[in-house]
UniProtKB/Swiss-Prot annotation:
The keyword Transmembrane helix appears for this protein: no
The organism's place on the tree of life at top rank: Bacteria
Active-site residues, Swiss-Prot/TrEMBL: 7, 68, 141
Location(s), subcellular: Cytoplasm
Species of the source: Nocardioides sp. (strain ATCC BAA-499 / JS614)
Enzyme Commission number(s): 3.1.21.10
Gene: ruvC
InterPro entries per UniProt: RNaseH-like_sf (IPR012337), RNaseH_sf (IPR036397), X-over_junc_endoDNase_Mg_BS (IPR020563), X-over_junc_endoDNase_RuvC (IPR002176)
One of the GO BP terms on file: DNA repair
UniProt protein name: Crossover junction endodeoxyribonuclease RuvC
Residues that, per the record, bind Mg(2+) 1: 7, 141
Subunit structure: Homodimer which binds Holliday junction (HJ) DNA. The HJ becomes 2-fold symmetrical on binding to RuvC with unstacked arms; it has a different conformation from HJ DNA in complex with RuvA. In the full resolvosome a probable DNA-RuvA(4)-RuvB(12)-RuvC(2) complex forms which resolves the HJ.
């Protein structure tokens, strides 16, 4: 399974692609951070993010997209930018018919480090170890995007298959009526 992990943000949007499956070694395909200038109007920044996500999906052909689930923080402007970038990423993936997994920060931290309250350094160190990298991905947005992809492969992939089976069973029951 190939997963594109997206750590959404209006200023820095981390994107990382990981190949692998449960019980098998995972492999880094690519990682980067898309940046937009705070000097630009928000709509232009969102278009930049949209084009960046589209380009990554086109280039890497992921089987699924994992996006950090937005949660409330005290800084409303940060939450708004994160939510806007997240929405753009979801629309781009949905337009292509890609399954989308939303994972909370604590779920991602727990998946890669065993501790839902792990710090950025610990998450980065574990991503480096899991993907057998020589150096830690930087900035933290890059490591977070890879952690999202890893989490989706380890957890979300199985959940997506369960959800698909339940949906298929429901449709089968409805068609018999």
């Amino acid at each position: 399974m190939r997963v594109l992990g997206i750590d959404p943000g209006l200023t820095r949007c981390g994107m990382g692609v990981v190949d692998g499956s449960v019980g098998r070694p995972l492999t880094l395909v690519d990682v980067n951070v898309l940046r937009t200038s705070a000097d630009l109007p928000v709509p232009e920044r969102l278009v930049t993010i949209e084009r960046g996500v589209e380009a990554w999906i086109e280039e890497h052909a992921p089987d699924a997209v994992a996006i950090e689930r937005v949660f409330a923080r005290s800084d409303v402007s940060t939450v708004m930018g994160t939510a806007q970038a997240s929405g753009v990423a979801m629309v781009v993936a949905a337009r292509r018919g890609l399954p989308i997994g939303l994972h909370t920060p604590s779920e991602v931290k727990a998946a890669v480090s065993g501790n839902g309250r792990a710090g950025k350094a610990q998450v980065g160190a574990m991503v480096t170890r899991i993907l057998r990298l020589d150096v830690m991905p930087k900035p933290a947005d890059a490591a977070d995007a890879l952690a999202l992809a890893i989490t989706h492969i380890w957890r979300g992939g199985a959940q997506a298959r369960i959800d698909a089976a339940v949906t298929a069973a429901r449709q089968q029951v409805r068609s018999r009526r």
